[in-house]
């Protein structure tokens, strides 16, 4: 056994106006949405360096990292920090053959984007749930399999590091291009 690929995808969506948010809530969000990934990465890097065969760290940073949503700052702030943090891991560990990449996904039905949250976010935007889920340039709902394929692509690209792959059907506001 050993570690050659890590996909870190933990997260939860704390909500509230940032100026009114209890500090405890923001700290809880950072603990899960940033520091849990840091703990995973530190331990994976330690093992990967001992193995001396390289490896890849893959993280879900979310579109919130580059395009914040109303009353969603508690979730978006740690994701924005994670975006730069992934690149820092790439910078500091490339010499060991260890790559670090991220996926910037949006509106994926999951444990975070639950039916209740879809209802809340679509109401906040004044659109139907279907229109909310297809609210991108392609007019197509992005599925969990689409995100999984992006992670697989990043894992297989042995000469790619510090990459952020966007999987959102086309959201110009969240585009890194």
Segments the model singles out, each with a brief description of its role:
Residues 2, 83, 93-113, 138, ...:
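Conserved Rossmann-fold SDR core element
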Residues 2-3, 48-62, 95-98, 163:
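Active-site loop of short-chain dehydrogenase/reductase
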Residues 12, 19-39, 58, 82:
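Catalytic Tyr-X3-Lys loop
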Residues 21, 68-77, 88:
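Active-site loop-to-helix junction immediately N-terminal to the catalytic Tyr of the SDR YXXXK motif
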Residues 95, 108-135, 177:
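A glycine/serine/threonine-rich, flexible loop-to-helix segment
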Residues 140-167, 172:
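C-terminal substrate-recognition "lid" of short-chain dehydrogenase/reductases
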């Amino acid at each position: 056994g050993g570690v050659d690929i890590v996909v870190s995808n933990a997260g939860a969506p704390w909500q509230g106006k940032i100026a009114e948010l209890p500090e405890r809530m923001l700290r809880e969000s950072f603990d899960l949405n940033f520091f849990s990934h840091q703990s995973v990465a530190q331990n994976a890097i330690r093992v990967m360096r001992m193995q001396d065969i390289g490896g890849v760290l893959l993280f879900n940073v979310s579109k919130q990292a580059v395009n914040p949503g109303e009353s969603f700052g508690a979730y978006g702030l740690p994701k924005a920090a994670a975006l730069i943090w992934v690149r820092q891991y790439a910078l500091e560990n490339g010499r060991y053959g260890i790559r670090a990449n991220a996926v910037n996904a949006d509106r994926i039905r999951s444990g975070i984007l639950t039916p209740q949250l879809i209802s809340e976010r679509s109401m906040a935007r004044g659109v139907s749930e279907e229109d909310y889920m297809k609210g991108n340039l392609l007019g197509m709902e992005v599925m969990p399999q689409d995100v999984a394929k992006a992670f697989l692509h990043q894992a297989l690209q042995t000469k790619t590091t510090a990459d952020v792959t966007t999987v959102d059907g086309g959201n110009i506001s969240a585009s890194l291009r």
